[in-house]
């Protein structure tokens, strides 16, 4: 067990406040100059590591003293993290750099419950922190033989282009009732209890235009990508999702696809390349392309509800800002679409801040998802079961040695509740990361007051008729693995058949798309799926839309009968160019007695699984 090292750094505010200066983030109109002075409180004879696992900074912001607590983001890189670039003659060069002693941190401001921080300590302090509701940026001043830093509000960075920046995903909701319903729900501790952590293994690709923009400096590009993902990781922690960087590929000699200003074309090409090339070389869950090409009218585009799909678990992002925080928020936004999150409506809220999933980029980038985003994300996860993000990082996946006090449970630790000053776990000895005498457990869904829960105590609620509840064994603090009823078992009074823990029926799918008073349409509506046109088809093969055979028409586009007030649409359907798959009948849906949908065919349930 390695003892946590607490380091204090005093930053004295320089008496001069600048009026204007050009920094990495752009032209800044109002800033403070501070000088970091590192004061180390190490035991006599102790060897100071290059980058401590826990640090504390004292500094003045607007003349007021604040304390910034930082902890190393030990889950930033995966164990098998790799980097790929290309020689001038096109030869692939892949390396596996040692990244365990990295310099990327998350943190908070003391006595500010709503504060956040994402900081790189590689060469001075660079990043952002939120203090009393305002976003501040910090970075070293590039002065010879000087440790001067600039601290400034994000709002004081001059914006070169004041035009509104939009996400390219469009919504054709004919009813906003589902979003309104979600906005009225409250995130409860009980609801969170049944949401197991998810783990997204992210792969980044940087195009040739970005290489040119950075004058071929690959190290500069890599550092920027690390800082961006560190912030994305911070953002998703509050969604109970951990984002780890598993790979970075830089198209240093030439683009591997044709990158065009037309975002839809580029996203489609990138998805095809990921499916046929990248996935054959590197296992990952989600890929994002960063480009310096000026995308027409948008700054990002992604498929909706596509996480884990070989082609569609992708997004593209325009690197339109020099501020890493801004690009990180765009990346979190596009990945949010992959996780089933739509743009926020007027019903959605994230407190007093602008929310990440608003269609346009906020004048001040937010690091908060709305209540609607939370429920849409977890509705997608629980109902569509994207299996690739189920593998939670185990202790053996943490690439650096175990460190007591970093709030990560690692090999050799019985518990880890943070530093002794911050630990709030009555079962855990924060100094040793061992359970206190008499304690059986310190965490887990089957741990109550430091003891194993009684046998039979429900620890994971039933999410559907096909997903029975799990109960504690009385011998462990962990809830047993989530077990579903066998696929094909009848459910909902024979209206459907179980599929991956759900009972998919068309009525529920119509409700999810259009809200209340909408039902499965008459059979005649589904005959439109025999056309093989842009919306009516059963499946796609090599990019071509295949019309449904007569016996398969209920396994193509979903049609619903809208009986809501003021509506009279007997064959209502949903179609979007950005996400053609949305609005199709879901796999496993009953299409006839004894038959279910499988890959666009209506097949016998006995042979489907």
Curated annotation (Swiss-Prot):
Cellular component annotations (GO), alphabetically ordered: extracellular region; plasma membrane
InterPro entries recorded: ADAM_Cys-rich, Disintegrin_CS, Disintegrin_dom, Disintegrin_dom_sf, MetalloPept_cat_dom_sf, Peptidase_M12B, Peptidase_M12B_N, Reprolysin_adamalysin
Short motif (D/ECD-tripeptide): ranges: 465-467
Cofactor list: Zn(2+)
Cofactor note: Binds 1 zinc ion per subunit.
Localization, UniProt: Secreted
Modified residues (Pyrrolidone carboxylic acid (Glu)): 190
Every Disintegrin domain range: 401-487
Peptidase M12B domain segment(s): 198-393
GO molecular function, one term: metalloendopeptidase activity
Designated name of the protein: Zinc metalloproteinase-disintegrin-like VAP2B
Propeptide: 21-189
Signal peptide interval: 1-20
């Amino acid at each position: 067990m390695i003892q946590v090292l607490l380091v204090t750094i005093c930053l004295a505010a320089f008496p001069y406040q600048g009026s204007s200066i050009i920094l990495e983030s752009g032209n800044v109109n109002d800033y403070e100059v501070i000088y970091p002075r590192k004061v180390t409180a190490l035991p006599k004879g102790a060897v100071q590591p290059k980058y401590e696992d826990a640090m504390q900074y004292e500094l003045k912001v607007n003349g007021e003293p604040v304390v910034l607590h930082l902890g190393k983001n030990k889950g930033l890189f995966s164990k098998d993290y790799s980097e790929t670039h290309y020689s001038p003659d096109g030869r692939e060069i892949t390396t596996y750099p040692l990244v365990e002693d990295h310099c990327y941190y998350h943190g908070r401001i003391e006595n500010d419950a709503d504060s956040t921080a994402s900081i790189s300590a590689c060469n001075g302090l660079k990043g952002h922190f939120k203090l009393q509701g305002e976003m501040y940026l910090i970075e070293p001043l590039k002065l010879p033989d000087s440790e001067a830093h600039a601290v400034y509000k994000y709002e004081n960075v001059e914006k070169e282009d004041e035009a509104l920046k939009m996400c390219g995903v469009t919504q054709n909701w004919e009813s906003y009732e589902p979003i309104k319903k979600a906005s009225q729900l409250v995130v409860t501790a009980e609801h969170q209890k049944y949401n197991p952590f998810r783990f997204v293994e992210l792969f980044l690709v940087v195009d040739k235009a970005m290489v040119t923009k950075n004058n071929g400096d690959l190290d500069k590009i890599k550092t920027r990508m690390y800082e961006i993902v560190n912030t994305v990781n911070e953002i998703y922690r509050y969604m109970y999702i951990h984002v780890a960087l598993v790979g970075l590929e830089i198209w240093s000699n030439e683009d591997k696809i044709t990158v065009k200003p037309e975002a839809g074309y580029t996203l489609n090409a990138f998805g095809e390349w990921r499916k046929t090339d990248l996935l054959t070389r590197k296992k990952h869950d989600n890929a994002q392309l960063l480009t310096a090409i000026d995308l027409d009218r948008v700054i990002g585009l992604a498929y909706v509800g596509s996480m884990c799909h070989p082609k569609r678990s992708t997004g593209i992002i325009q690197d339109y800002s020099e501020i890493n925080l801004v690009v990180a928020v765009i990346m979190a936004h596009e990945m949010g679409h992959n996780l089933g999150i739509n743009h926020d409506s007027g019903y959605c809220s994230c407190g007093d801040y602008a929310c990440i999933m608003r269609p346009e980029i906020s004048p001040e980038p937010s690091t908060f998802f709305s209540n609607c985003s939370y429920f849409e994300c977890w509705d997608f996860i629980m109902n569509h079961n994207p299996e690739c993000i189920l593998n939670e990082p185990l202790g053996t996946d943490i690439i650096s040695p175990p460190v007591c006090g970093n709030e990560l449970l690692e090999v050799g630790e019985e518990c880890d509740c943070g530093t002794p000053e911050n630990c709030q776990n009555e079962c855990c000895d924060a100094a040793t990361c061992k359970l206190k005498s008499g304690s059986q457990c310190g965490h887990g869904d089957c741990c109550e007051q430091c003891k194993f829960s009684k046998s039979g105590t429900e620890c994971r609620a039933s999410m559907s008729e096909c997903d029975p509840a799990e109960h504690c064994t009385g011998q462990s603090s962990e809830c047993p693995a989530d077990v579903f009823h066998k696929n094909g078992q009848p459910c909902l009074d024979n209206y459907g058949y179980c599929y991956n823990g759900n009972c998919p029926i068309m009525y529920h799918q119509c409700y999810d798309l259009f809200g209340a008073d909408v039902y499965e349409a008459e059979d005649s509506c589904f005959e439109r799926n025999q056309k093989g046109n842009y919306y009516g088809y059963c499946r796609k093969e090599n990019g071509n839309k295949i019309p449904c055979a007569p016996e398969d028409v209920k396994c193509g586009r979903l049609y619903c009968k809208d009986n809501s007030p003021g509506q009279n649409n007997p064959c209502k359907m949903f179609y979007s160019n950005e996400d053609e798959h949305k609005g199709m009948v879901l796999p496993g849906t009953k299409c006839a007695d004894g038959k279910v949908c499988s890959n666009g065919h209506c097949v016998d349930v006995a042979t489907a699984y």
